[in-house]
Amino acid sequence: MGINLFWVVRLLLEQRSVQLTEDEQRLRQFCFPLLNPADVARLCRMGTWEYIEVGTCLVEHDRTLARLSVIVSGKADVRLDGVKVAELGDGQFVGQIAYITGEKAPVSVVAQASMRIISWSRVKLETFFKDRPDVEIQLGHSLGADLTRLLKSAWQSSR
C-alpha cells in the first residue's frame, strides 16, 4: 500500500509541476491532445528539436528512415517522382508511412519554407513504448489521423 501511495503522490506532483514551452504546447495540441503534460514533456526531452532551411530534404524517396518527425512550424512539399503531390504544415508528421510500415520511404519530403521540427529515433521511441504502451497507442491514433488528412488532401487535389 505504501509503495502505491508513493507512486500516486509522485505522479500527481509530476503532473502539477510540468510547464510546457510554447513549442511543446503546440506539439501537444496538434499531435497528442490526450496525453498529459508530463508525458508530452518526456517525449520532447527524448526528441531532437531542429530548425530546417528551405530546400532541405527531410525524407528521401526509397530510403529507410531512422526517425519520425513532426512539423512544429513551417511547410514542406511531398514529392513523388519530383512532382508535388501534397503539402505538409504545422502539426503534421514527416515520414509516417515509412515509420508505420518499417519500409523505405515511398516519397520525398522537402522543406518549402523555414521549419521547426522535432524528431525521434525509432529506437528511442520503441524503448520508451515498452514501459508506456498508452503513449504508443496515442501516437498510433495521431499517425492514423494525420495519414487520413494527407490522403484526403491528395485525393481532393487530384480531382
For each of these PLM feature ranges, what is it?
Residues M1-T21:
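Transmembrane alpha-helices and immediately adjacent membrane-cytoplasm interface residues
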Residues L5-V8, D39, A86-G144, T148:
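Cyclic-nucleotide recognition modules
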Residues I3, D23-F30, W49-I52, I118-V123:
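Juxtamembrane/interfacial segments around transmembrane helices
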Residues R26-D81, A86-A98:
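Regulatory nucleotide-sensing modules
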Residues L151-R159:
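Short alpha-helical interdomain "coupling" segment at the junction between an upstream regulatory sensor module
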Residues E14-Q15, D81, S119:
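Short, flexible segments with low predicted structural confidence
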